[in-house]
């Protein structure tokens, strides 16, 4: 015991000596201790940083600015309304979906089998997948959704995608789709969003669209299975204007759960107001479909994404215009000259600030990875002028517009000899001609009777006609008196006087119709100047999209049309160029017809082999460009601005604007550190 006490005493004594030292050398000791603490802390921090990593954390609210109002937030009545499509993309799921590379992958589907040479698709659903209200998703929901889309009483805009498709429930988690013929694009149809049967099965077709647009539906039955679910709506009670809709994370989502806690959609009626709120940081994201308005945004403050999608703008030349329209564009050489005269680089730079690509083909080789066409119409003003000169269109200095003279044969001419006692339609025309005061009149054919019979009166009139024009009719044969028979020289003079060839002056001009929106206005003005530079006069007409669709496109009532077309994930130009689609509701806008092109389009559509389909489409591309029925211009990018606080956005290609949310589950605002 004494030894222990002695030992403790010695320890206390040494500690006391240390304290005395610290008092004696207070400052030096303080800094030594502080240095040791700093070193140890730094080592700890270094080791922590070395052995941990920053990863996305849960939480954060993302605010998206939307121009316009939602109308039908449901896949059944999904239209071109961007607000509806954006919300549906986050609230609902399909059997298949697009990933960030634009590829089609499984969504609700666990497995997909394609059987019977592409005529049968069998899908097995994932286990334990649920609606936002907790009800399980089964094959019944899939069958119900497709039946609703196919039922004409519901009048769904999506119905055309499901014509001729038979769906059958095999088990609670297996369904089969049977096609009449193999169709490679059907895989894309399987991205259709599925709706819950238990919510909508008791609502009649007449009531359903009205219910979808009601506040009751949004607050009570806006049930999907997507990564986000409905939380609240902010709506003006007096006007019904929806100010915002907020979605919250679906914690029971069957796939990877989002990091963001909420996504709010803020709705604006004017783009200027939206852009102001974006610049002030009141909203975190806004999608601009063209370069319009970009100059008002400080790009340095945002993440700026140029999103590629398979849409393109072209000038379409009607190959079979209405009778009251000019047919000048049915000339392949004229179309070729117009093509060479277009400065596509100027259009790209001045209309969309180079945010897009120049295109030369209907199958967008740069987007889909196809081979480019062998022939490209690069800007060449001199070549365009040379083609028009060779076509007979001469430049008129006074007007700056090209014209050419065309000699058209008369619809009738005397081609056979006529003589006494003949009876036929040629005699009828002969009598009319002789009775014409400018040719003969009373001095030659006093009675002027038109009977179709070559009698004495007619014979005498022919004699007088021959003698009146004896220098041309009789003199070449050394005759002084008429013969009364209509032969070579007489026929020639009759044709010259009564049925001359018609000389027509054709002015190189046509009308171009397009949409009354700024981008199309700017493009059309450049086109007009490009064509004016080679002596072509163009009248530009602007129409609203509704008027354009109903009065212009549907009846094919135009000469030239500046418009856009959108392809899908699996490029299928069939609707736009196959001859079977020439009449509305087909989308062959210009009445294009080529049997070889038709065959290639049919083969490409039926092929499930990617390489073979590519070969068919590339062959079709060559034929179409050779026929030159349109001028391919550009493929604009979508410009997506997001706040720099948002991370994780990695979308490369999208099929439509709403697909910018494809990898939304990877977006994050907050971060945390975890051990490696």
Predicted regions and their residues:
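Surface-exposed binding/hinge segments that line
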Residues: 159-209
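A structural "hinge/loop" feature
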Residues: 68-85, 108-109, 135, 157, ...
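Append "and occasionally in soluble cytosolic enzymes with long acidic Gly/Pro-rich linkers
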Residues: 240-249, 329-445, 488-529, 593, ...
């Amino acid at each position: 015991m004494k030894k222990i006490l002695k030992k403790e005493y010695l320890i206390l004594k040494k500690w006391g000596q240390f304290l005395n030292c610290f008092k004696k050398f207070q400052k030096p000791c303080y800094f030594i201790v502080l240095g040791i603490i700093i070193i140890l802390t730094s080592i700890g921090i270094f080791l922590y940083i070395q052995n941990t990593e920053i990863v996305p954390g849960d939480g954060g609210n993302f605010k998206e600015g939307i121009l316009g109002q939602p109308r039908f937030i449901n896949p059944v009545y999904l239209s071109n309304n961007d607000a509806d499509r954006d919300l549906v993309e986050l609230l609902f799921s399909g059997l298949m979906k697009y990933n960030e590379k634009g590829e089609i992958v499984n969504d609700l589907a666990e497995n997909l089998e394609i059987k019977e040479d592409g005529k049968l698709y069998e899908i097995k659903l994932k286990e334990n997948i649920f609606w936002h209200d907790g009800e399980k998703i089964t094959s019944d929901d899939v069958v119900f959704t497709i039946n609703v889309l196919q039922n004409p009483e519901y009048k769904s805009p999506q119905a055309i995608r499901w014509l001729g498709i038979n769906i059958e429930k095999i088990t609670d988690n297996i369904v089969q789709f049977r096609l009449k013929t193999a169709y490679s694009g059907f895989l894309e149809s399987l991205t259709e969003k599925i709706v819950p049967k238990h919510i909508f099965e008791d609502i009649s077709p007449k009531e359903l669209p009205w219910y979808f647009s009601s506040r009751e539906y949004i607050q009570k039955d806006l049930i999907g299975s997507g990564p986000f679910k409905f939380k609240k709506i902010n709506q003006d009670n007096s006007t019904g204007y929806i100010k915002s809709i907020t979605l919250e994370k679906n914690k029971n989502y069957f796939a990877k759960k989002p990091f963001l806690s909420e996504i709010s959609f803020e709705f604006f009626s004017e783009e200027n107001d939206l852009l102001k709120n974006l610049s002030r940081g009141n909203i975190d994201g806004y999608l601009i479909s063209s370069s319009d308005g970009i100059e008002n945004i400080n790009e340095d403050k945002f993440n700026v994404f140029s999103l590629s999608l398979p849409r393109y703008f072209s000038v379409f030349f009607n190959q079979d215009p209405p009778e009251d329209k000019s047919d000048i564009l049915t000339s392949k050489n004229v179309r070729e000259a117009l093509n060479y005269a277009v400065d596509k680089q100027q259009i790209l730079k001045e209309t969309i600030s180079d945010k897009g690509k120049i295109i030369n083909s209907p199958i967008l080789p740069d987007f889909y990875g196809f081979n480019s066409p062998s022939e490209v119409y690069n800007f060449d003003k001199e070549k365009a002028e040379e083609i028009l000169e060779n076509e007979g269109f001469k430049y008129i200095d006074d007007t700056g517009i090209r014209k050419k003279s065309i000699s058209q044969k008369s619809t009738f001419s005397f081609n056979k000899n006529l003589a006494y006692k003949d009876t036929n339609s040629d005699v009828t025309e002969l009598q009319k001609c002789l009775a014409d005061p400018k040719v003969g009149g009373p001095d030659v054919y006093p009675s002027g009777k038109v009977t179709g019979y070559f009698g004495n009166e007619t014979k005498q009139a022919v004699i007088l006609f021959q003698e009146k024009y004896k220098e041309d009719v009789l003199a070449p044969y050394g005759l002084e008196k008429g013969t009364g028979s209509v032969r070579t020289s007489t026929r020639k003079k009759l044709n010259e006087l009564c049925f001359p060839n018609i000389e027509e002056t054709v002015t190189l001009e046509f009308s171009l119709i397009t949409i009354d929106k700024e981008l199309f206005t700017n493009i059309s003005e450049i086109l007009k100047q490009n064509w004016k530079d080679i002596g072509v006069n163009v009248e530009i007409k602007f129409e609203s999209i509704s008027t354009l669709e109903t009065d212009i496109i549907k009846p094919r009532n135009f000469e030239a049309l500046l418009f856009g077309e959108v392809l899908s994930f699996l490029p299928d130009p069939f609707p736009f160029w196959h001859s079977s689609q020439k009449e509305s509701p087909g989308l062959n806008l210009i009445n294009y017809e080529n049997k070889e092109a038709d065959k290639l389009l049919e083969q490409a559509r039926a092929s499930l082999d990617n390489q073979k389909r590519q070969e068919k489409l590339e062959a079709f591309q060559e034929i179409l460009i050779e026929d030159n029925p349109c001028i391919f211009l550009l493929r604009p990018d979508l410009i997506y601005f997001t706040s720099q606080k948002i991370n994780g956005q990695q979308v490369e290609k999208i099929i439509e604007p709403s697909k910018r949310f494809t990898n939304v589950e990877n977006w994050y605002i907050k971060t945390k550190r975890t051990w490696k």
